[in-house]
Amino acid sequence: MATYVKTANKGEVRVLFSVPKRYFRKAVDRNRYKRLLRESYRLNKETVTTAITDKDFGLDIALTATSNQKPTFRRIETVMIAILKGIIYEEDN
């Protein structure tokens, strides 16, 4: 699940990763999920940062895990790409 808010910081994108204890009881599993989320964002952040650089606002994005299935990098990356493209699409229109 992704939530974002426009901020006054021009062209700045900040991201929050959250994995609730409700879905993953062990800290090892939560940390792995967050690590995969961070890596996926790192590899795909260029799409959102290039779209926001010339705008007069910034974005704060919160990504929260809402599934209790064990994550795979491929699944997380496809969802991450879809989320980032969706945010860009909503802000352009």
Predicted feature locations:
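Positively charged, solvent-exposed patches that mediate nucleic-acid binding
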Residues: M1-N93
